Amino acid sequence: MILLRQPKQYIQTFLTSPSDNSQIVTATLYHAVPEQTNNDNLHTASMFEINPECPGSHRILAVSRDLEELGFTLGSVVRISQACEMNGIWYIEDRMNKRWKNKIDFLVNDKIKYGKWYNVKIEKIN
């Protein structure tokens, strides 16, 4: 499809608008520690048990509550793109504090300290 002579705003919207089963979000990292979770840092909101030796091996996502209202619910399988090394298949097993909007968190090992990505595409595949 060629979009010649279209307004720049239309082309930008066409290229970046999410489909019905996807959303564009901001993504950050979190660790399985009480400071970043609740007191039971080895269980997610869905009661999935986290391996304390290697929490990042599960590929677990936490989603903001507004995304849950859009169908990104606990137990969903999603594809992440536009997040560099975090791209791929992830499992929604946790939810974020209600103060966050349009945001996801990747559960990672404590060796990975920082990470933030903008315009990340989250696409529901199940």
Language-model regions, residue ranges each:
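Solvent-exposed, well-ordered loop and adjacent helix/strand elements within mature globular domains
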Residues: 5, 10-126
